[in-house]
Amino acid sequence: MKILAIDVETYSSIDIKTAGAYRYCEGPDFEILLFAYAFDDEPVQIVDLANGETLPDEVIDSLDNPTILKTAFNANFERNAISSDMYFPNGMPPEQWECTMIKALTMGLPGSLDMVGKALNFEEDKQKMKEGKALIQYFCKPCKPTKTNGKRTRNLPEHDPEKWELFKEYCKQDVEVERAIRNKLSKFETTDKEKRLWQLDQVINDRGVGTDLILINKAIECDLIFTERLQNEARELTGLDNPNSPTQLKKWLGERVGHEVTSLTKDSIPGLLEEAKDDNVKRVLELRQLMAKTSIKKYEAMEKSRCEDGRVRGLLQFYGANRTGRWAGRLVQVQNLPQNHLPDLDDARNLLRTGQFDTIEFLYDSIPDTLSQLIRTAFIPREGNRFMVADFSAIEARVIAWYAGEQWRLDVFATHGKIYEASAAQMFHVPIESIKKGSDLRQKGKIAELALGYGGSVGAIMSMDKSKSIPEEELPGLVKSWRNANPNITKFWWDCDKAAKKAINERTTVCMQYGLKFIYNPGVLFIQLPSGRKLAYIKPKIEVGKYGSDVITYEGMEQTSKQWTTLETYGPKLVENIVQATARDCLGEAMFNVEEAGYKVVFHVHDELIMDVPKDFGKLEEVNEIFGKPISWAPGLPLKADGYECDYYMKD
């Protein structure tokens, strides 16, 4: 198939970081400045659209030709930019595109062109140009009007012709680097199903989800009034110009509690409240707590990223978590929305929409908490539709039991599904009927289930058991009981550890159950999942760890520092990746199946799909059945879904 590689440089006064690509490309002054392209291995060409050049007919025809594959690094942006700036009746259908960034992510590489080039040790002429950031800042964003620049708000090519020529070289170089990455990774096949899943992901992101602008604006207004009132009260009590300033407030508090106050975090304030004798000091600390709780960032993110038709697009990044291939949240970060527990959610929502802020304060414990619980409800279906929400029930627990052949767990999932109760019964040798919701044993079963599936020990339980419901001295016994009750799972951890080490040491392939394989390929360890998809670990080695035993190392992105570095892994961690990746593949199957049945997915969160469906179409039972359909590559995996319908998004 003929390939057309593309990179565009654009201008818009909208900030892409806060608004996202879809809203950015809708900006009234959005335009493509430069269009670099190359067919197959031909030299890269540049079209200077900003200076009146036009795209050759061959390129225009190719953009609309389904037999020519278009590629780009982060193709979602190029698709959006071209659709917005040029007229194509069918837009830029994702099935005619491939994304080299996604290819890099599937190989365990970073998600930026610059870092991929470095990770692959490309020569300088195949690396992204270092001057790029400054050039983008100069030509692609509004500039500050100054006396020196004649009070202009935008830099055009004629304002610095030398920089402009360099910018053209930079744009061409991006195509060179993208092509070099694509060629280097082309020997590693992507399955057809993964290609189709990316295409569906693009359709879902293009589709977007509706938002309630009245609710969003009222939430922002309510927060502003509430925060201003708290700040005024704090000013009166302290006499400080800015009681929000930690430096000023620490000094003021220190003078009144008799010692230096070094921290004002949510963990340190309760201690200060306990020792405070003065009522004013107590109230100031309470105000500080309340001000810290007010977070309307997600409402603001919705407002900024909302497109002209009221929909937010681009909420999900395909393969954003590249150890597992799961999606990552973008813009509103739907993967970590606060839960709603208000019994009268509808009333609270209506009070906010109609601006009855005083009533909200009178009826509910806390305005920040109420606003937080209403965030989900700002997502709304189309006129005449309702949301259908369905998610896999305990999917990771089911997948790990299936892989490990832990029969008692499979029996639980094939029948009543009460895994917390069954786990406690198995661990403490009591009848399951004796364990009721809310009982101590059920709580222990639940915490053990959530903390111990991937090799977790005492530390994992302590971080999971926030309320300290289990005495510390009981924790080692709990770990032992769980592992004794799940011998096949603990065996599976170390079987995977041995398989990975054998594959690396002997440069071979180790086959396990259900088509799970550990495959050594020069420079890469692949874990092939039953679905056929492969997880990649770059430059794997067996090295001596800090405790003197052999450990598996590989190169990857360190999650907190975002640096490309050497990472360690071991059996239980590999099992976590395998299980979560398999659960993700199950979600992919459900996405294909619900779409085929006419249910339109607008976004998804972990193992849950949110579908925007006409009120006279479809049944929840059908959706649950679709989720529970046996998967050909996972024989015997017991899948089950729970679902509900709603007029706005919420947690049931």
Q: Across the structure, where does each feature detected by a protein language model lie?
A:
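A common structural junction motif
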Residues: 625-635
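Active-site palm subdomain of RNA-directed nucleic acid polymerases
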Residues: 185-197, 586-608
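Conserved "right-hand" nucleotidyltransferase catalytic core of DNA-directed polymerases
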Residues: 1-10, 14-16, 34-36, 119-121, ...
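A short acidic-Thr-Gly-centered motif at the start of a beta-strand
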Residues: 1-2, 60-64, 371-386, 592-596
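Generic long, charged, amphipathic alpha-helical segments
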Residues: 419-439, 547-602
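Short active-site loop/helix that positions an aromatic residue
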Residues: 76-89, 107, 250-256, 393-407
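Conserved catalytic palm subdomain of right-hand nucleotidyl-transferase polymerases, strongest
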Residues: 5-6, 73, 97-99, 379-395
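Active-site-proximal helix-loop-helix substrate-binding element of RNase H-like nuclease domains
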Residues: 27-33, 37, 41-186, 343-345, ...
